[in-house]
Amino acid sequence: MTDSIPKKPLKKGSLVFVDRGNYIKSIEALASDNDLPNYVFEGPGEILSVKDEYAQVRWRRPVPDVWFKLDQLKEYIQ
């Protein structure tokens, strides 16, 4: 039996950042630009929508919203 705290699911309104290790190993990284800007890895971005295993993320910059797999995102904690 483990005493770990259960992980909260990411949902609309959650603040997140992209986990560099999970993203680089993903098939999505192979199909995308391999030079993502640092702000996606530093956060925070806000989840606007969740569909199946993907989340639409908006950054606090004048850039388009982006879809990431939920397993590539981590909760942003200050």
Curated annotation (Swiss-Prot):
It is found in: Cellular thylakoid membrane. One of its GO terms (molecular function) is oxidoreductase activity, acting on NAD(P)H, quinone or similar compound as acceptor. InterPro entries: NdhO (IPR020905). Keywords: Membrane, NAD, NADP, Plastoquinone, Quinone, Thylakoid, Translocase, Transport. Pfam families: NdhO. It is an enzyme of class 7 (translocase). GO terms for cellular component: plasma membrane-derived thylakoid membrane. It comes from the Bacteria. Its EC number is 7.1.1.-. It catalyses: a plastoquinone + NADH + (n+1) H(+)(in) = a plastoquinol + NAD(+) + n H(+)(out); a plastoquinone + NADPH + (n+1) H(+)(in) = a plastoquinol + NADP(+) + n H(+)(out). It is a peripheral membrane protein. NDH-1 shuttles electrons from an unknown electron donor, via FMN and iron-sulfur (Fe-S) centers, to quinones in the respiratory and/or the photosynthetic chain. The immediate electron acceptor for the enzyme in this species is believed to be plastoquinone. Couples the redox reaction to proton translocation, and thus conserves the redox energy in a proton gradient. Cyanobacterial NDH-1 also plays a role in inorganic carbon-concentration. NDH-1 can be composed of about 15 different subunits; different subcomplexes with different compositions have been identified which probably have different functions. Belongs to the complex I NdhO subunit family. This is NAD(P)H-quinone oxidoreductase subunit O. It comes from Prochlorococcus marinus (strain MIT 9312).
